[in-house]
Each structure stands twice: as structure tokens, then as C-alpha cells.
A protein has these predicted regions:
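Acidic, metal/ion-coordinating pockets
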Residues: 1-197, 237-249, 259
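Catalytic centers of hydrolytic enzymes
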Residues: 74-83, 87, 94-95, 163-470
């Protein structure tokens, strides 16, 4: 592809040192820097490259690259040993000033694996608009991560986010008037170019054909039977087979008494029948490990209160139970209904018997009575709670803001670290010869929870119709 530079993303770091260190070396051997100027070693120097200086048509260009500063909230520390991740503000401006003074580039591009965000300084993982508003001496901010396809121009700087899945190419244009190497005038603009999936590059297709076929063969192999339909959207209305499966997997961890889990696929149907390996990516799309963490009963309740507060409103007649709003879809431009908050942070609990009263305010909705086996639940007792590595590291702020737990110091609370959850799913299917409704819906194992009062069900159904149609 002959890239001039590549930025490190959180899913690169997720692969671990063995992979991304090799990728960095391979890229470097081909003259391509792997950029992440805010991933710093204990001595303060960048772990990866931080800048690329190049010339095009006599114009000197500086490309500064940075990655997401929120890595610690998603990934286990063993994946990023030897580095820390600094906030992009004020670091990016400081680095721009240093490079501009030293190299005197005529064009400056800041490429970040960070989302567009809201521009109000509140979203640590998405600082694109924050940078657009504050940076000086920069022509383009190229961002990513949150899959929002958008171009924003402010004064003499453009933000470009091409979205996800190679559906668009971000296209920035700059017009310069130069005299004796000095910039007399400059203008920038940008747009997004739709990728035509029918126009295949035959050389690229040939180069990757054997790799494609190998992956295809692996993902199409049969792995077991599914005797019940799984619909991920059912997770938002209460207990459902899909979430029951995820809780069953989590509670299979040795010593786990309770599990926290959220739907990681927003709206997907996995129909009963013969499963292929590729279906496992629909059931569990991310590379999260399973951790077991010690929490008190009171902390469990507070975590659930925080989770459900991002998920539901305090219901009033003719209002919405689900915390939804109508707005424009950034990907399609069409108006639709959507959750205000990220559904992948809508944790419910397995292994407990509890209710969530939608008529009560935050802090008094969740009433836990027993464990799944009937043992009385105590606010003062300690429990082993299975959760993703993302959640244990502070992702979604459920532990920190919900229960006041210091997620920077979790080591004393972590009881066990297990394999990636998709691998646990695969092993479960092999051991159980498939996924069977009787096993995953066993309330003696996964417990039971529901929204109350029962009269709220009709309002929830209306909200679900707004979100997903009839």
C-alpha cells in the first residue's frame, strides 16, 4: 500500500508485545513508522516512533502520530508493559511546537487513534474535536476509533474521520502559495470518498488470495450445534438466551460466584442450527479476557445501579423506560432512535436473583435477594465476580464511578485471569457438543433478574420497537 505512516490503535496493543513489536519492526524495515508519540517508556521517551518528516513536490510535511490515551481502561497491563499512555492534551500541541521549531515544515498533519468526540473535553477516548478547537500550527487532524464518518472544518484546520470498515476514504486537499520556501498563503478542505466494493484491485486480491482462503477455511469450519435462536437485541429488555449464554460462560470460571456481562453485539441474530467458527465472532466479537475480581455485596449492588442508570430512565407514564433519543445517524445521515449511552456498558449480573425497579431513582432500583443457589445475599460479604478484562481495568467506569473502586490498583482484588472469552466459548461448545437452551437458561446456575413493575413491560416493548422496528 506504500503508506507514509501508520498509527497504533487499541486493537493493535490488544494483540500483545509479540505481535505489535514484530509489526513495528516489519513496518520500519519497509520505511514506514508505527506512530504513537504518547505511548512513553519510563524514561519519558516514546515506545514507538512519534513523527515522520517527508517531502512531496518540494513541500516539507510533518506527520505526528498518537494513539488512544485510554488504553489502561480497556486492556490488561501485561499487554502494554514498559509504557504509559499520556493524554493528547496538551501533549500534541507541545509536540507540534517542538517539531515545527526544529523541522520548519510547511504542512503539519496530526494523525490520532482517537474518536471525534463531542468537543467538550469530557470523552477521554475521543479527543478529536477537542484538538480541532485547540491546536495551532496544524493543517489536518486525522482521527478514527469511534467509527464516526465525519469531516469538520474550523478556520484553517480540517478534521477527517473516515469511519469504519473501509467504507470511506478520507481525502484532504491543501493549496499552498510558496516563495523561497516560505508559505505565503494556505487553504485546506476535505471530504469523504465512498469506496466502491465492486472495484477490486486485482493485484491486491492476488497477493492476499492464499491468506484469504486460509482464513475462510478456518472460519467456515463447523464447531457444534445451537438449539435456540440468539438475538442480541433482546438483552436490552431483560434476561434472554444470548446473555444467559455469556453469563454461563463467565460463571464457568473456577471460583466465580457472580458474573457481570453486557451485550457486545448491538443487533445480531444467530439462528439455531449448525454453528461455524465465524458465528463465534457474532456471539463474542472482542478479544476480552475473563477476570475474576473480589467485590463486596454492596459494591456489586452499586455497580449494577450505575450500569442500569446508563441503560434506563426513571419511568413516568407516557415516558421512555429505556434511555433512548431520536437523532441523526452519523453513518447514514438518517434519523433514527438510539441509546444515549454505549450498550456495551449495559452490564447485568449472572449468579444472582434480583429486580430492577424502573419507577425508582438511581441508587434505589436494584434489589438483590439471593445467589442463584438460594444462599442469602449480604452487602457485607465478599464475592468472586467474573467480568471482562475491559471492565476490570475500569472500562465503562462501572467499578470506579459506580462503586468507588480504584481501578488503578486492582491487583489485590484479582482472583484469577482466564483465557479470551471467545476461546472459552469455543471450548464450551466442544465440551457440551453445542449450545443447548436447557443448559444456558438454567436459573439454578445463572440466577434470575427482571425489570419491575410488570406494567413497565409494555413501555419497554414500545421503546424496543422505536429502536429496532416491529
Amino acid at each position: 500500500m506504500k503508506y507514509d505512516a501508520v498509527c497504533v490503535g487499541n486493537h493493535d496493543v490488544e494483540t500483545g508485545h509479540n505481535v505489535y513489536d514484530r509489526v513495528a519492526a516489519d513496518l520500519k524495515a519497509n520505511g514506514i513508522p508505527f506512530l504513537a508519540g504518547n505511548a512513553v517508556k519510563p524514561d519519558g521517551k516514546p515506545y514507538f516512533d512519534s513523527v515522520r518528516i517527508l517531502k512531496r513536490h518540494g513541500v516539507k510535511i510533518a506527520i505526528l502520530g498518537f494513539t488512544n490515551p485510554n488504553m489502561k481502561a480497556w486492556l490488561d497491563e501485561k499487554l502494554w508493559t514498559g509504557m504509559q499512555f499520556e493524554s493528547l492534551i496538551p501533549l500534541v500541541q507541545n509536540e507540534v511546537d517542538l517539531i515545527s521549531a526544529k523541522e520548519k515544515p510547511q504542512v503539519v498533519i496530526v494523525a490520532i487513534h482517537s474518536g471525534t468526540g463531542k468537543g467538550d473535553g469530557t470523552i477521554y477516548e475521543s479527543q478529536g474535536l477537542d484538538l480541532l478547537k485547540s491546536l495551532r500550527g496544524v493543517d489536518f487532524v486525522v482521527c478514527s476509533h469511534d467509527h464516526s464518518a465525519v469531516v469538520v472544518q474550523q478556520d484553517s484546520i480540517c478534521l477527517i474521520n473516515s469511519g469504519s470498515r473501509a467504507q470511506n476514504i478520507g481525502h484532504g486537499r491543501i493549496r499552498l502559495a510558496l516563495k523561497d520556501g516560505k508559505v505565503l498563503a494556505k487553504s485546506v478542505n476535505a471530504d469523504l470518498i465512498k469506496v466502491n466494493a465492486d472495484r477490486v484491485d486485482s493485484k491486491m486480491e492476488a497477493a492476499f488470495h492464499s491468506d484469504y482462503e486460509a482464513v475462510k477455511k478456518f472460519t467456515l469450519r463447523e464447531v457444534g450445534d445451537l438449539d435456540i435462536d440468539l438475538r442480541t437485541r433482546d438483552s436490552y429488555a431483560g434476561m434472554c438466551p444470548y446473555m444467559n449464554l455469556i453469563h454461563t460462560l463467565s460463571l464457568s470460571a473456577k471460583s466465580a460466584q457472580v458474573s457481570f456481562a453486557a451485550p457486545l453485539t448491538f443487533n445480531k441474530d444467530i439462528n439455531a442450527g449448525r454453528l461455524i467458527y465465524n458465528d463465534l465472532f457474532s456471539i463474542y466479537p472482542y478479544e476480552n479476557q475473563l477476570f475474576v475480581v473480589r467485590l463486596t455485596g454492596d459494591e456489586i449492588r452499586k455497580c449494577l445501579e450505575y450500569s442500569y442508570d446508563s441503560w434506563i430512565n426513571t419511568y413516568v407514564p407516557d415516558g421512555h423506560v429505556l434511555k433512548i433519543a431520536e437523532g441523526e445517524d452519523q453513518r447514514t445521515g438518517q434519523k433514527n432512535w438510539h441509546f444515549i449511552n454505549r450498550p456495551y456498558n449495559f452490564d447485568s449480573a449472572g449468579g444472582l436473583v434480583y429486580t430492577v425497579d424502573v419507577t425508582k431513582p438511581y441508587g434505589s432500583r436494584v434489589c438483590i435477594t439471593t445467589l442463584a443457589d438460594g444462599t442469602p445475599f449480604s452487602s457485607d460479604a465478599w464475592y468472586n465476580v467474573a467480568m471482562t478484562s475491559y471492565r476490570a481495568a475500569g472500562g465503562g467506569y462501572i467499578l470506579s464511578k459506580g462503586a468507588g473502586i480504584d481501578t488503578d490498583n486492582m491487583e489485590d482484588r484479582i482472583v484469577a485471569r482466564h483465557d479470551d472469552i471467545r476461546n472459552i466459548l469455543y471450548d464450551y461448545i466442544q465440551k457440551s457438543n453445542g449450545i443447548h437452551a436447557a443448559e444456558i437458561n438454567d436459573t439454578q446456575r445463572i440466577g434470575h433478574w427482571e425489570f419491575v413493575p410488570a406494567s413497565a413491560a409494555q413501555a419497554i416493548d414500545k421503546d424496543m420497537t422505536l429502536l429496532f422496528g416491529e
